[in-house]
Amino acid sequence: MSEELQQKLRDQLWEVANKLRGNMSASDFMYFTLGFIFYKYLSEKIEKHANDALVDDEVTFKELWAMEKNEDIEELQEVVKTECLENIGYFIEPNFLFSSVIESIKRKENILPMLERSLKRIEDSTLGQDSEEDFGGLFSDIDLASPKLGKTADDKNTLVSNVLLALDDIDFGVEASQEIDILGDAYEYMISQFAAGAGKKAGEFYTPQEVSRILAEIVTIGHARLRNVYDPTCGSGSLLLRAASIGHANEIFGQEKNPTTYNLARMNMLLHGIKFSNFRIENGDTLEADAFGDTQFDAVVANPPFSAEWSAADKFNNDDRFSKAGRLAPRKTADYAFILHMIYHLNEGGTMACVAPHGVLFRGNAEGVIRRFLIEKKNYVDAIIGLPANIFYGTSIPTCILVFKKCRKEDDNILFIDASKEFEKVKTQNKLRPQHIKKIVDTYRERKEIEKYSHLATLQEVAENDYNLNIPRYVDTFEEEEPIDIHAVMKEIKELEAKRADLDKEIEGYLKELGLVE
């Protein structure tokens, strides 16, 4: 994979995005841009797939559909359509391909009605197919009648046409299957750039790559190949994809509450070459309507919304996810509701890692009861990792990573890592560099103690701290100041005062020579 090609594609796609920026918010022009990129990708992919299927028939996809209809032609068309639906999950007739829309633009036609039909035809082609859930409503956020695209129909048509023409000039590399990672990388880059400009909204759909890397590395330790990976608040799916890639996972599962972000996650899966039959992303509220029943997973990763509200309804006292902990998570801080949900879906030999605000480590009342249950009764807490502040878009609060395992032994300790001071400041953000990530992961893997960085606490030690997991209780990062020699300081002050007096006399002499003072 060429880094130069990667950067070129990133720059080209971001330039296209800026054509749409105008008066739109970052999130608005993100969905249009990523949707159009995805449409071009699907078009090029199906054209390649259909052409490959027709090699022995010595006819191209477009040529076949342009032929005069007869029984043999229609039969061959149906074979191609069925083959596409079974293998890549969707079908686009040649006159609805991205390239056909471009031809209409070059003829100076109004392409919005055709484009709208094209996107609808992609979704409709999957009805009744195994891929229906993966494609249904996928383009619902692309509103071509939106006033954000322009005041008049002509304005809208001109803007969208210019964006599509710019995309047409970019080589996605779909013809070369090994280049799929380059396009996937560029798509991830686009999402990260949009997140940087989305402020607080960024947390709804994006986990910084550095944090994703740590979570993914941790949950894959000890697993040559994961059977599956799950994220209950999957956002755009970036964290899921990272964990699946590092762990060579066969299947990917996720749930996302926001319908728009849910669409983004499904696009992200498909654009990274994940076959429709190998992932299942559901739209819904994870806590209120768990889409995965009693399914358990080899690895669970998540960056749940920090201290979000949930109903904490009485019915959850009888919900197997929460009932054994003794108390429900507070209505105004659902952090432990997400944690208990994730643990419920973790299999006995798996690892779970999630991001949370530091409050989960020490808050009392119901959360204190749940925390004690997880440590004393279950012995599930494997590690606590403190991260630097200001590494997430839209919030500057310090965060931590919590690692859980169900297969811990009675005498296992809990590893505390304080990585809060190891980062590089880049403009207004703090960044974790490869060496910082490596130190965190290596320290966790080797479970080693490093002075002022990590500590292995026994369960007895944690109990003596009343099950408070606040990192400073276990990792002493205090730097002693060198003792001050008062006598030496006083001597230095006297010497400086004497020098100042000498300089004052010297200056006074110069001023007298110049006649400026008597």
Describe the role of every protein-language-model region.
Residues 3-5, 157-158, 183, 187, ...:
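Short, flexible segments with low predicted structural confidence
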Residues 4, 290, 294-518:
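A conserved structural/catalytic subdomain of Rossmann-like adenosyl-cofactor enzymes
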Residues 201-302, 307-316, 322-325, 336-337, ...:
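Conserved S-adenosyl-L-methionine
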